[in-house]
Every structure is written in C-alpha cells, then in structure tokens.
Amino acid sequence: MSEQFTRREFLQSACITMGALAVSTSGVDRAFASSSLPINTSGIPSCDVLIIGSGAAGLRAAVAARKKDPSLNVIVVSKVMPTRSATTMAEGGINGVIDFSEGDSFALHAYDTVKGGDFLVDQDTAMKFAEHAGEAIHELDYIGMPFSRDKNGKVDKRYAGGASKIRCNFSADKTGHILTHTCLDDALKNGVKFLMDHQLLDIGVDNGRCEGVVLRDIRTGTIAPVRAKSVVLATGGYTRVFWNRTSTPYIATGDGAASAMRAGVAFKDPEMLQFHPTGVCHGGVLITEAARGEGGILLNNQGERFMKNYAKKMELAPRDIVSRSIETEIREGRAFGKGMEAYVLLDVTHLGKEKIMRNLPQIRHIGLLFENMDLVEKPIAIRPTAHYSMGGIDVMGLESMSTAIPGLFAAGEAACVSIHGANRLGGNSLCDTVVTGKIAGTNAASFASSAGFGSGTHLHDLTLKWMSRFKEVANGKGEVNEMYAIREELGAVNWDNMGVFRTESRLVALEDKHNELQARYDALRIPNTNPVFNTAFTEYVELGNILLASRAARMGAEARKESRGSHYREDYIKRDDANFLKHSMVTMDSNGKLHLGWKDVVVTQFKIEERKY
C-alpha cells in the first residue's frame, strides 16, 4: 500500500492542513483558522491537546485543558460548527442540586439516577456525578449562561421524568442551544482554536499509547495525520443507527466509538439506546420532556389519559416506560393512524398561551414548522423516537475519563462511564457533557504537559490506508443511490428488530441482515471522484461507522437475555440481576471480528430493588 504514495505526496497531504483556511487577524476568525495546527520537525501537523467534537462536552474539555495549562495548544476538531452540534437540540434542562431547602440532596440525585438507569449504573460514579452536577450549574451561571429565573431571581427549575425532587434547571425550552453558545463564548475567550469541516477517520496508537488521529478535510478532501500528545473524543452518540427514526442530528454516527473500537477500546453497553416518548410523528424531531414537566398529558384515540394505566407518575415516569406505553397503545389499536404513521397526542392546551410562550416557545415553533399546527390551540401528534446512546466508549472512571489507551480520553455522549445505565433520566445529559467534558479536558492537559509526541509510524500507515481507500472507493463506477439504499435499509431493520421491543428471533435475523448490508457496503463504490466537498465519501465513512455500531448493539442486545431499562426483551420480560447486573463489553480484533465480554456493575450504597414509579 505504501508504495502507491511518495513521501512528497504524503507530506503534501499532511501539510495542507496548514493552509486550509485563510488566516484572519480578527479574534473569532483566527480561532476558527486551521493554521492553528503547527508543523513539527517531522513535517506532520501537531498540537498538545486535540479534541474531536464541538458540542458542550468538547467545548468544556477545551476550556478545562486551557485553564489547566495555558501554555498548551488546544484544538477542537469538528465536522460542523459548534452551533450545529447535538447539544443545541437539547431543550428541557440540566440537572443539578443547587437548592437544598426542599429536601433535595446529592445522594437523592444519585439514587434517582441509579434507579432511573434500572440499576445498571455504577453507583460510585453516580454519587460523584451528582456532586459535580451542582458545581457545574454554579459554574455555568458564573460564566454567563442566561438561565430562566424564578420570582426571587434564582435559577428556575422544573420537574423531569424519574426525578423525586425538582432539580432540572432550565433556560425556557432552549437550554441546550443557550448552553452551547455560552460554552463557545467561553472557549473563544480562553484561546481555544477550532478546525471546522474535518472528519475523524481513525486513531493512531504507538507502543500502546495514543499518538494522534487521521483527519479528512471535507472541503478539500485532503487526508492527513495530526499528532497529539493527548486526544479527547467528544463525538456524541450513535442513534443514527435508526437513521430517520431519531431526534439527533445527521452527524450522530458513532464516529468516536467506531474509531475507538478499531484502536482497541471496548464499546460498553452498546445495546442501551434510549427511545424518547415524544418525537414529532413525521420525522422524529423532539418535543421536549419539559412539555410533560410543565403539565402536558398524553391521550389515545379514546381521549383517555392512558399513562394512568402504566405508572403512578404517569407522564413523568422514566422515558423507557413512557415509550413502551405509547407503543403498546399503538399495537393494541388505541392510537390514531396506522403503521409508521400511527401516533398518540400530546396535549398542552390547558397550560394556556402565556405559560407556553414563556416556558415552551420552541416546541410551539416545532409544531408549526413540522406539523403545521399550533399546540396552543390543539394537541400535537407524537410517537417514540431514538434519542440517546447510554452505551459508548469505555472509560476507566469519572475522575479520569481516560480509556484503556494512555493519552486517549472520552467525554459526553460518546463516553460510557456508566452514569446512565440502561436508561438516562431527562436533564442528566447536558449535565453529563459539562461534567465529563471538564474532567476529560483537565486530565488530557495533565497528560500532555508531561508527555512527548509518538513516533507517528502508525499514523503514517493509517493515513496511507485511507488515501488508498478513497482512490478505491471514489472511482466513479458506483451506482448513484446504492449507499443511500443501504443506509435506509439499515435504519429500518434496526428499528423493526432492535427498537422499543426486541426478541431473540428478531435479533438473530438482524445479524443476517447486518452481514448482508456489510457485504454490500464493502463492495460499495462512489460515482464522484472529485475529492473537493465529496459529501458522498463523508457519508460513506459515516455509514461504515453506524454499521459497526449496529453490529455491536445487536450483539449486546441478543446476549442480554433480560429486560432492563430501554432494553426490553418480549421473550425475557423480567430483569435478571443474578446473570445480567453487568455491563456488556464489545471489542473488535485485528480481523474486524467482534467479541463480547462482561464487566460487573459497581454497587456501593443503594440497594438493588424492583424499579417502580
């Protein structure tokens, strides 16, 4: 493979990162200029701390790294601008105990998190997380996040599903959007540099430690190695395995988890995918849990508030319970419409226009935009949609956020430190991003401060491999729509066989379908040979990643012969703590074969008990 490229060609490719963007003298433009990647003595671009992903986790990691050691060159790499990250789509709020006057506590937040995750949560991690969460809210308030305020001027709170106390701090129903802008402003203020429109291809490992990554400039098509003393993966989740039946952006293709697996890191609990109860019927766009937190109710085609039949907390039961309840209503004929068009109603009309416009303005806009209806006046059609990845890159613990590979860290939804277990509570995801992002960035900076660069040998080989792969795949001979057909089929079969309800027979059949789709993917060729803005190749790489994530999730789902949280097996409807109070751990060998192992859940202070709401 290496004979296909001269050293001159290789270094030209590596150095193109230097001039990919015009350098501007203004602060913001300069921060987003790719010239912030210096060239080291090997002729390969490098930096001290490289962060992949520009959502809240990546931004908080970058700021933490800069604050830990201001002398470090910290670069954030992303496929899109930070304001287009998945974080901006989070609406409801961010959990954190900052008011103890109503009997709330860190221990109660931790218990709610453990119970909400159906006891697949590592309890020591949950306790530390709850303690960090309150601190994170104060820190965000300090750096200027414009939270909604109560009549006393304090940060306002609302209930979220599965919470025993009111601790979900919010900014109307745009909390993620506002959080992103706050974190981006803070990153720019602290001298963080950005490399936009770049795609992660692979992670280099040299003598057992991370030596950097291989990136592709989406605009020019240039494939280049970037050496780094430490790397933080903050690439988000992988719910695009369901393709169009998800509330997450198109970039949520598991790039970090797939790359980490290829580098030798385990994929923990990949089968744990959350289905949010209230996605807009046509398209899956999210209607925030805040709508139910503010008093919204769910109705079937008989006008019945059906959640009273499933849980005492009704609409504020955890998401997995509400999602299964809605799907049961659909299955048993008490929904509106049929098939993929079936739905129930979310009604907030009784809240009144003033309250909706004050606390839920964005969901009103979503209703008008996607359903051409005003939820001030009538209920909106909803059904469950894939929303969040509880599984992810295995990290060693909350206090480090480091992987098994020295110098490689992970944060946010990309990581699985076992905060969320089998079901994430509403409001815990945004908190996860800022808590784990800060910890990962701090430790990545500490590692980089005392580490040197790797040899670059593995990065060199990986870069040549990807350059060859582009030439092989983008050869102009492929069928125009084949890639999109594979992607649509993958999403559909995953939803049908690995969605809200799962069985052995469906999961076994899904393995055969995955093998068929993988074979078609391996033979796939792209009609566009031009490297410049070759979005087909961008999507080709992403499709490979969601195929790998799908295979890992299916393997975990078949092996876990129980029902727990979001993982519901109709052939094993009971939770089985004796055999499955364990994390599934999927690894990949050098031949691309997947292997499944198990790791015990950490149980400390909370008794394992039946989960009731």
Swiss-Prot record:
<dbReference type="Pfam" id="PF00890">
    <property type="entry name" value="FAD_binding_2"/>
</dbReference>
<dbReference type="GO" id="GO:0009055">
    <property type="term" value="F:electron transfer activity"/>
</dbReference>
<feature type="binding site">
    <location>
        <position position="288"/>
    </location>
    <ligand>
        <name>substrate</name>
    </ligand>
</feature>
<comment type="subunit">
    <text>The MFR complex is composed of three subunits: a flavoprotein (SdhA), an iron-sulfur protein (SdhB), and one hydrophobic anchor protein (SdhE).</text>
</comment>
<keyword id="KW-0249">Electron transport</keyword>
<dbReference type="GO" id="GO:0005886">
    <property type="term" value="C:plasma membrane"/>
</dbReference>
<keyword id="KW-0285">Flavoprotein</keyword>
<dbReference type="InterPro" id="IPR053593">
    <property type="entry name" value="FAD-oxidoreductase_2/FRD/SDH"/>
</dbReference>
<dbReference type="InterPro" id="IPR014006">
    <property type="entry name" value="Succ_Dhase_FrdA_Gneg"/>
</dbReference>
<feature type="binding site">
    <location>
        <position position="424"/>
    </location>
    <ligand>
        <name>substrate</name>
    </ligand>
</feature>
<feature type="binding site">
    <location>
        <begin position="429"/>
        <end position="430"/>
    </location>
    <ligand>
        <name>FAD</name>
    </ligand>
</feature>
<dbReference type="InterPro" id="IPR036188">
    <property type="entry name" value="FAD/NAD-bd_sf"/>
</dbReference>
<feature type="binding site">
    <location>
        <position position="255"/>
    </location>
    <ligand>
        <name>FAD</name>
    </ligand>
</feature>
<dbReference type="InterPro" id="IPR003953">
    <property type="entry name" value="FAD-dep_OxRdtase_2_FAD-bd"/>
</dbReference>
<feature type="binding site">
    <location>
        <begin position="53"/>
        <end position="58"/>
    </location>
    <ligand>
        <name>FAD</name>
    </ligand>
</feature>
<dbReference type="InterPro" id="IPR030664">
    <property type="entry name" value="SdhA/FrdA/AprA"/>
</dbReference>
<dbReference type="GO" id="GO:0000104">
    <property type="term" value="F:succinate dehydrogenase activity"/>
</dbReference>
<protein>
    <recommendedName>
        <fullName>8-methylmenaquinol:fumarate reductase flavoprotein subunit</fullName>
        <ecNumber>1.3.5.-</ecNumber>
    </recommendedName>
</protein>
<feature type="signal peptide" description="Tat-type signal">
    <location>
        <begin position="1"/>
        <end position="33"/>
    </location>
</feature>
<feature type="binding site">
    <location>
        <position position="276"/>
    </location>
    <ligand>
        <name>substrate</name>
    </ligand>
</feature>
<keyword id="KW-0560">Oxidoreductase</keyword>
<feature type="binding site">
    <location>
        <position position="387"/>
    </location>
    <ligand>
        <name>substrate</name>
    </ligand>
</feature>
<dbReference type="GO" id="GO:0009061">
    <property type="term" value="P:anaerobic respiration"/>
</dbReference>
<keyword id="KW-0274">FAD</keyword>
<keyword id="KW-0472">Membrane</keyword>
<keyword id="KW-0574">Periplasm</keyword>
<dbReference type="InterPro" id="IPR015939">
    <property type="entry name" value="Fum_Rdtase/Succ_DH_flav-like_C"/>
</dbReference>
<feature type="binding site">
    <location>
        <position position="413"/>
    </location>
    <ligand>
        <name>FAD</name>
    </ligand>
</feature>
<feature type="binding site">
    <location>
        <begin position="78"/>
        <end position="93"/>
    </location>
    <ligand>
        <name>FAD</name>
    </ligand>
</feature>
<feature type="active site" description="Proton acceptor">
    <location>
        <position position="319"/>
    </location>
</feature>
<dbReference type="Pfam" id="PF02910">
    <property type="entry name" value="Succ_DH_flav_C"/>
</dbReference>
<dbReference type="InterPro" id="IPR027477">
    <property type="entry name" value="Succ_DH/fumarate_Rdtase_cat_sf"/>
</dbReference>
<dbReference type="InterPro" id="IPR006311">
    <property type="entry name" value="TAT_signal"/>
</dbReference>
<comment type="similarity">
    <text>Belongs to the FAD-dependent oxidoreductase 2 family. FRD/SDH subfamily.</text>
</comment>
<dbReference type="InterPro" id="IPR037099">
    <property type="entry name" value="Fum_R/Succ_DH_flav-like_C_sf"/>
</dbReference>
<keyword id="KW-1003">Cell membrane</keyword>
<dbReference type="GO" id="GO:0050660">
    <property type="term" value="F:flavin adenine dinucleotide binding"/>
</dbReference>
<keyword id="KW-0732">Signal</keyword>
<dbReference type="GO" id="GO:0022900">
    <property type="term" value="P:electron transport chain"/>
</dbReference>
<dbReference type="GO" id="GO:0042597">
    <property type="term" value="C:periplasmic space"/>
</dbReference>
<comment type="function">
    <text>Flavoprotein subunit of 8-methylmenaquinol:fumarate reductase (MFR), that catalyzes the reduction of fumarate using 8-methylmenaquinol-6 as electron donor. The complex shows no succinate oxidation activity. Is involved in anaerobic metabolism. SdhA contains the dicarboxylate reduction site.</text>
</comment>
<keyword id="KW-0813">Transport</keyword>
